[in-house]
């Protein structure tokens, strides 16, 4: 007989896997899919925390039917209104017209806009409580992690924190729902960084504030139940919490990301010389990304991870190579902080790339290393020394 996964005797995992979609938010590649997590608590009153993408509502409702056996859903707590979590709300209300919807003021503004629902609402603020029998929920507002209406929900008897998108990750779940069953833990944490960089990274100060509020409440947490990815158990959650503490505080590892575009291989040769110079100077973590081939989400993951960033571009139509410009914009809008930066370029007849790359450090309020250099055509011997020296300068600054 099919068994719906359980976190405790009365708390069920009713999320679904999406292995069909190629890009999360129609932007970020998800080769291993993604999970849309929702949770059902059964007590004197039944309470659902979030829903799933409407494309998977049939699977979601089937799970609810198996558990409820004809009982209604009494409450829906909305931690996050984004359609991958709130997409089935309208259908859910049609099924359970007497269901009370729990959220904050901003939740209800969005609920009206996305679903036209304006009745049967139960508004909560930080510190408010809702009892459904032996279970009691309290609420903690977490605005801009990563939408303005986001809130966390804490269930006291089982010590569960339902954390919306915080502590989530890309990747569908393969049978097990708990982090204790992860067979490739570091790979999963790498995916968490990629998810954070792409989806939440712009809002680091708000993440940091939400983490501080969790600590201020003194919550005793046994399980953390995010909207994507595994459910964290107490011991394993230290990994996820530590990762979020570091990322939201702009803490980085000693290492360098080299981003380059190259039409005919000349700029790529310069990137390789820089990497070799860094290695010779003792830098252990060096990542080179050809921006026309590397996945942008993987590039962002590495930019969030390492302190050093070197960008190289050929001149193209008197401007930057457009894939480089696109990546710079992704970095710009995430307001990545506290990096050590260097630049280099190439051209055939009219130099332009380097003078457009140099101001990026000042714009982002980063520390710039060196003046950079620029290769004309394929005259590699004329700049090989400058490339090597720039790598050495970057290494020295990282180790200072």
Feature names for model-found ranges:
Residues 5-9, 102-150, 206-209:
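Metallo-beta-lactamase
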Residues 5-64, 152-155, 159-163, 267:
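Conserved beta-strand hairpin/beta-sheet module of binuclear metal-dependent hydrolase folds
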Residues 44, 55-102:
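Active-site metal-binding motif and surrounding structural segment of the metallo-beta-lactamase
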Residues 49-51, 73-81, 101-105, 161-164, ...:
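Active-site neighborhood of phospho(di)ester-bond hydrolases with catalytic His/Asp-centered motifs
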Residues 88, 294-299:
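Short acidic active-site motifs
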Residues 226-253:
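Terminal amphipathic helices with adjacent charged low-complexity linkers/tails
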Residues 146-150, 158, 166-201, 247-251:
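Active-site-proximal loop/helix segment associated with metal-binding centers of metalloenzymes
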Residues 173, 183-224, 229-231, 273-287, ...:
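FMN-binding flavodoxin-like domain, especially the glycine-rich phosphate-binding loop
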């Amino acid at each position: 007989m099919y068994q719906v996964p359980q976190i405790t005797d009365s708390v069920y995992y009713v999320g679904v896997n999406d292995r069909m979609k190629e890009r999360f938010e129609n932007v970020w590649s998800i080769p291993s899919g993604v999970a849309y997590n929702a949770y059902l608590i059964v007590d004197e009153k039944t309470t659902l925390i979030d829903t799933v993408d409407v494309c998977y509502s049939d699977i979601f409702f089937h799970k609810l039917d198996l558990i409820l056996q004809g009982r209604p859903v009494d409450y829906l707590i909305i931690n996050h209104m984004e359609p991958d979590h709130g997409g089935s709300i309208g259908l859910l209300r049609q099924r359970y017209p007497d269901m009370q919807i729990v959220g904050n003021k901003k939740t209800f503004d969005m609920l009206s806009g996305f679903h036209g629902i304006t009745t049967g609402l139960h508004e909560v603020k930080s510190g408010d409580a809702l009892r459904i029998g032996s279970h009691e929920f309290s609420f903690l507002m977490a605005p801009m992690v990563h939408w303005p209406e986001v809130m966390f929900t804490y269930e006291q008897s089982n010590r569960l924190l339902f954390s919306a998108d915080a502590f989530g990750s890309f990747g569908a779940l393969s049978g097990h729902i708990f982090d204790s069953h992860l067979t490739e833990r570091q790979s999963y944490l790498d995916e968490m960084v990629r998810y954070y960089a792409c989806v939440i990274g712009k809002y680091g100060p708000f993440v940091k504030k939400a983490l501080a509020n969790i600590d201020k409440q003194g919550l005793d947490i046994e399980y953390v139940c995010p909207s994507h990815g595994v459910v964290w158990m107490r011991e394993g959650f230290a990994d996820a919490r530590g990762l979020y503490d570091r990322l939201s505080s702009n803490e980085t590892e000693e290492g360098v990301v080299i981003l380059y575009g190259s039409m005919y291989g000349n700029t790529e040769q310069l990137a390789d010389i820089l990497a070799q110079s860094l290695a010779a100077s003792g830098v252990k973590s060096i990542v080179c990304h050809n921006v026309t081939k590397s996945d942008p989400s993987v590039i962002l993951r590495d930019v969030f991870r390492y302190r050093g960033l070197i960008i190289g571009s050929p001149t193209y139509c008197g401007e930057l190579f457009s894939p480089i410009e696109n990546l710079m914009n992704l970095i710009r809008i995430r307001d990545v902080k506290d990096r050590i930066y260097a630049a280099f370029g190439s051209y055939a007849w009219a130099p332009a790339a380097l003078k457009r790359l140099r101001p990026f450090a000042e714009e982002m309020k980063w520390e710039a290393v060196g003046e950079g250099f620029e290769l004309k055509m394929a005259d590699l011997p004329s700049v090989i020394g400058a490339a090597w020296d720039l790598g050495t300068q970057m290494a020295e600054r990282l180790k200072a």
